[in-house]
Amino acid sequence: MNNIKLPVLYCPFPSAINQHCEAAYQHTLEWVRSFNLLEELACQKLFAANFHGLMARVYPNASLKALEILTDFMYLGTIVDDAYEKAGTSKQPDLLEPEQARLLNILKGAELTDVDTPVALAWGDFVQRLHQFPYVTSEWMLYFVKHMEDYFQAARWEALNYSQGIMPDLVTYIKMRPLVFGIYPFFDMILIADGIALPPEVIECPAVKQMGLAANNAMAWANDIFSFKRDIKEGMVHNLLLVLEHEYQISLEEALKRAVELYEAEVQNFIELSLQLPSFEAGIDTNLERYVLALRFWMSGYLDWIMKSRRYGKFSEYQLL
């Protein structure tokens, strides 16, 4: 495994970094500490993963106010996601549902209480601030809530698999991975970060949804390609390479080759779909073009970040060509 060489993944999209990256980082670091979400050593380890750098790359045009809440959301989501993985590997997946239900109720308007956890209190602060953005309409909230519900349900599925030692088959994994990955709520945030107004007929357009799925899949496969070493070390079975290896009884090297092919196919699919989108009307088409550009920044920014993040090991450890 140590000698496996990963190729440089294909991504023909522009890259940029938000000028407010450092300020957003300082804000979120204090925000996480203010809610006592982590012990100090765990906090330092988490921020070493540079998720603030990820947010600055995938939302390069966001204002400072927007980037702050996006970075808060990213770090809080990571804390929650790591807790869900731990619940699964410690064979306690039933712990997830009550907390998830509480977070969803807060998102839908429930008041905070004295018995809420630090995560719930931080989430409540996030939700309150979220409503201050003009593009957070009732329609937008419906999509955001639905995508959070989908993520929570998928996280329970993943945790149950971990607790029971279940390796999903390839078809099931490909179906569930976009939901477990948790990117759709961040795609919703593009409208906040870039000030884009898209009516429901555009958001629900099959071609637009397929384009979003292609972007989601490409990043999920990139994640699995770069994280397989950590996943093997930690006993995680939810990884495309490991699923391919198990499904087809092939070597890890061959699984890597097939995973890269799946990644490249999704990038090409995204390109083709983005060039074949239907026309709506002038103003809407302009905003849709901006949305496509934002997805391109997501794909390139995510790849830039994951190649450098300490969360998955140093770039040099993988001996990239």
Regions found by a protein language model. Give the residues of each.
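Alpha-helical, largely C-terminal catalytic domains
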Residues: 1-321
